[in-house]
Structure formats: C-alpha cells, structure tokens
Amino acid sequence: MSALRYTLVVNGSVYGSQSARTAYQFATALIEKGHTLVSVFFYQDGVTNGTELTVPANDEFHLTKAWQQLAKQHNVRLETCVAAALRRGVVSQSEASQHGLLQHNLAEGFEQAGLGSLAEAMLTQDRVVQF
C-alpha cells in the first residue's frame, strides 16, 4: 500500500474528552506507518488544544506540548479555527492586536486559520479523519 496524505480534524477539548488524545495517538501511528500527516485542524472545543495556558498535573500527559513536538518533528501544520478559538478565548498575537486585547495565548507552533483551510485540505488530502 502506498503512503497516503492525511489531515485530522479534532473537535474534542484538550482534556475534556478522549478524542484529542486519540487523535494524537492516531497521528503518531500513521506517521510510524509511513503516511504523511499534512495538518491537524482544531475546531469547536478542539481549539483548546492550542492554548499555551494549559498546565496539566506533573504526572499527566501534556497534550499541547505533544502536538507541538509532533508538528516540529514531522512538519505538520497545527491550525485552530479562528472563529471557534476567539469564542473560547484562544487568541493569537495578531488577533489580540486586531481586537484591542492586551494578551494572547495561542501556543507556539499553532496558527489560526479559517474554514477555507479545512475545505482545501478536504479537497487535496487523500484522507480527512475527524475526532
């Protein structure tokens, strides 16, 4: 079987459900099998995966840092839906400036994107898997 190109869509919050962790495990498995993970699009409550203000207990898995490391090692785009993120208080530096906010909290390695980016991924990747 030839290698496929994937985009994942993560709707589950960083620690509120199992879906984000399952998406991460799926991502690492498909890379190990030789497939390419092009991007992960965080939508709805999934945008909370992109806040740098998440501080899990010392004995818990740090999912945000895991996504960052995966992205850096395998050149994966981490995109949070800008509209969903703003509604949930996940704000990039440029959005903070645009909306007159004094602070921003989008974690390094994540970017904010519109639904057009997800639509493009659906048209160009071999597989789009939603969690």
UniProtKB/Swiss-Prot annotation:
Molecular function in Gene Ontology: sulfur carrier activity; sulfurtransferase activity
Keywords, comma-separated and alphabetical: Cytoplasm, Transferase
Enzyme class, broadest EC rank: transferase
Keyword hit for Oxidoreductase: no
Gene Ontology terms: biological process: tRNA wobble position uridine thiolation
InterPro entries: DsrEFH-like (IPR027396), Sulphur_relay_DsrE/F-like (IPR003787), Sulphur_relay_TusD/DsrE (IPR017463)
Active site, renumbered: C81
GO cellular component annotations of the record: sulfurtransferase complex
Protein EC: 2.8.1.-
Compartment(s) of residence: Cytoplasm
Major location (coarse): cytoplasm
Membership in a protein family: Belongs to the DsrE/TusD family.
Function: Could be part of a sulfur-relay system.
Protein name: Sulfurtransferase TusD homolog
Species of the source: Vibrio vulnificus (strain YJ016)
